[in-house]
Amino acid sequence: MCGIVGYIGTEDAKEILLKGLEKLEYRGYDSAGIAVATEEGVHIFKEKGRIATLREVVDQGVKSTVGIGHTRWATHGEPSKVNAHPHQSESSRFTIVHNGVIENYEQLKRDYLQAVTLQSDTDTEVVVQLVERFVHEGQSVEAAFRHTLSLLKGSYAIALLDKKDTDTIYVGKNKSPLLVGVQDGVNVVASDAMAMLQVTDQFLEIMDEEIVIVTKDDVTIKTLDGTAVSREPYTAELDASDIEKGTYPHFMLKEIDEQPFVIRNIIQKYQNEDGSVRLDEDIRQAVMEADRIYIIAAGTSYHAGLVGKQLIENFAKQPVEVHIASEFLYNMPLLSKRPLFIFISQSGETADSRGVLVEVKKLGYKALTITNVPGSTLSREADFTLHTHAGPEIAVASTKAYTAQMAVLTLLAADTAKAKGIDLGFDPIQELSIVANAMETLCNQKETLEKIARDYLAVTRNCFFIGRATDYFVCLEGALKLKEISYIQAEGFAGGELKHGTIALIEEGTPIVALATQEHVNLSIRGNVKEVAARGAFPCIISMEGLNEEDDTFVLPKVHSHLTPLVSVIPLQLIAYYAALHRGCDVDKPRNLAKSVTVE
């Protein structure tokens, strides 16, 4: 949620900042702005709405080689031009952009700023006014910046300009992602490396409660007490072409099509020369020593976790619980004696999951992160990490990250089973290869799936997805995809629960998408379809080859029964995509949603 960029170098800062913000659009935002410094002062341009709107108001006549930029997701104050970042101090000396939530900003206003008239409703403006107050009291800018950050409770990633010293950007971080990119004669600031790949692929990780003093030729990292910190940059495992649509009309469609290649990439990364699964011995040992596994996740990652539970319990005979991250700490379950926590997050920055991880580490328990972003907060703070190797996922609605998470969970479950001496009776690597081929087949059936979306969903108000056993978990994900991008009220239900209330919502023409990929519940789910059809529903049955019947709407290529979620979700992704397209929705950037949820 939100995004920050900063640039100090020799090129036109305006265009670099705007391009950087465009690369952060996937994170979700409702307004955007930039500030660039010149000898005459700091020039601010900001607007409610898209970055394209911001571009229209930027004065191209202003020449600058230093600046900061921001995309805002409203948390304090409505989406508006006034509340958009950047914000300035009362005298306009200091200019700030900020991601995160300052939990004690009201108290800080009462304690320090009663004589200041604030111009916005944001928590951010309090921060920049505090810096100015402490400078007026005689502190240096650096000392005032550190003093201010030491007072803040909550999360923040901050970049600050001083119009009396336009050769410096002051940066601070706590519980919100922020990187500093380095290059000869040029340095940059970004919430995400993707934003500044146009400038450099060398980045410094900034830890919580650190500040960075960034000039054109130097980067100095310090703790809040002023202690200098030494750190080497790392090379971002990204290519600029990874974050372009190429010939695709939308990132979501591109990322759906990339799924077969992602699965093959995962196989390559986690396969020994003899064809067996290769995981770090430390991870294997941690899983083996655990008497219960607790999977913590949110949204799509939570749905992957539900499938992961089935895989681990069925393969490795190890008990697993799956919890929604935002709810876990409110009523923590009675933990087993030797728990292992697995955190699943595409970005590795999910605030709710990080909150649980912090508490878990305080209790002394081991944690494993499954993420698509190496070097992310969850990756750094957990004991172990499994990387999903899916490549950048730009569309807000997750597709390839979901199937990648399930593939990695498959390998984790299979490796644990092997370590326990359990014979699965099949080769997981080989079966995942079959899955990749099946995915490719499905991605080539877009016309059929577009027709289903047009016939069933283009004009509907609501839709229900039903399934049993593992299919139910995929139905939850299919419903989420549809509601995320098409704004259709969609819900996933266990087939057996229909008669316990949901069937009351069925009326003439209600679309029902039913999954039938599991032999042991095939007759039961078909019975549910007959129940709703008898009450006027418009059923769409998606079945597995070998279980299909003549009137089924769509038939999936056959894969191993435990791995059906990796293929059955693809038609649901494509149906959601085409439904959104036919309804005129913004597929890649749906309203009110953010890709990376970095505030609680």
From Swiss-Prot:
The active site is at C2, K595. CDD domains: GFAT (cd00714), SIS_GlmS_GlmD_1 (cd05008), SIS_GlmS_GlmD_2 (cd05009). It comes from the Bacteria. The gene is glmS. GO terms for biological process: carbohydrate metabolic process; fructose 6-phosphate metabolic process; protein N-linked glycosylation; UDP-N-acetylglucosamine metabolic process. Homodimer. Keywords: Aminotransferase, Cytoplasm, Glutamine amidotransferase, Repeat, Transferase. It catalyses: D-fructose 6-phosphate + L-glutamine = D-glucosamine 6-phosphate + L-glutamate. Its EC number is 2.6.1.16. Residues 283-422, 452-590 form the SIS domain. This is Glutamine--fructose-6-phosphate aminotransferase [isomerizing]. Catalyzes the first step in hexosamine metabolism, converting fructose-6P into glucosamine-6P using glutamine as a nitrogen source.
